[in-house]
A protein has these predicted regions:
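Rossmann-like NAD(P)(H) cofactor-binding subdomain of soluble oxidoreductases
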Residues: 27, 37, 45-133
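NAD(P)-dependent Rossmann-like dehydrogenase/reductase catalytic/cofactor-binding core
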Residues: 204-260
Length: 260
């Protein structure tokens, strides 16, 4: 996810490659980052990289957060830095505990350090992502900065932290759920007589068109469905067959199961 965010920030023009410092333990990972743009600075020293940064994005596996926070926290500067974690399941309270917030507050006159959680989905790399943002201790200016960063990668919204799990199910897991529909429709297209590559392009553009119609019109999905559904027609027959097989219930059940 860290690589996807970095590539998206560069692609959107929000950041210049030379403004980014990407750290990773593996040289193979660092090399892959530089292959995208040689101007991106890479390294393995998290503490040194964090000391230079205004915005520190923790894009590591949850079980690595404790180690990384231990490396970067001694040099944190409340006056100019914020931390944004995209580690799944790591709460704002967890971040505060790992940072040793009381000692930080002593250094900065009692103010709390600004922490953010961000849950982006993988489409941020193509600037069509969805990112949920929660925060604690941040100023309006800092909230605006983080929102601008992730809005450059698609759609970003600030939510209460208790909705982060639901957001993960709806948008992050939702990418996989949408892909499963696309795969099923592609297979159906092949059964109807199209070649696999033809079916793939048809379904991809159909889904893109459906989403674009909603985004540009602001209409409810049912209003767009009504436009192509006539009495006794083939669309209503197809919709009814899908509902008989439990389409809507299956989607809702999948979202609820993923909301843990």
């Amino acid at each position: 996810m860290g690589g996807a965010i970095a590539r998206g920030l560069i692609k959107s023009g929000m950041c210049r490659p030379e403004d980014l410092i990407c750290t990773a333990k593996s040289e193979a990972t660092r090399s892959k980052i530089r292959e995208y743009d040689a101007a991106i600075r890479t390294g393995s020293n998290n503490g040194a990289a964090a000391a230079e940064a205004d915005v520190i994005i923790l894009a590591v596996k949850p079980w690595h957060v404790t180690e990384v926070m231990g490396e970067i926290c001694p040099g944190l500067d409340l006056g100019r830095q914020i931390i944004v974690s995209v580690a799944a399941g790591v709460t704002l309270n967890d971040l505060e505990q790992l940072a040793g917030t009381p000692s930080l507050e002593e250094r900065v006159g009692g103010r709390s350090f600004p922490f953010f959680r961000a849950i982006p989905n993988t489409a941020v790399e193509v600037l069509c992502g969805v990112t949920f943002i929660a925060q604690h201790g941040a100023t309006e200016e800092q909230i605006g900065l983080v929102c601008r960063l992730f809005s450059a990668l698609g759609y970003a919204l600030v939510v209460d932290e208790k909705l982060m799990s639901a957001g993960t199910a709806l948008a992050s897991c939702g990418i996989a759920f949408a892909m499963r529909y696309i795969r099923a429709a592609m297979e159906g297209g092949v059964e109807l007589g199209f070649r696999p590559e033809e079916a793939a392009r048809i379904v991809e553009h159909t889904v893109k068109g459906a989403a674009t119609l909603l985004l540009e019109s602001g209409a409810h999905p049912e209003a767009e469905i009504d436009k192509v559904t006539t009495a006794g027609g083939i669309t209503i027959k197809g919709l009814n067959a899908m509902e008989k097989a439990g389409f809507t219930a299956a989607v809702i059940d999948g979202l609820k199961a993923a909301n843990v």
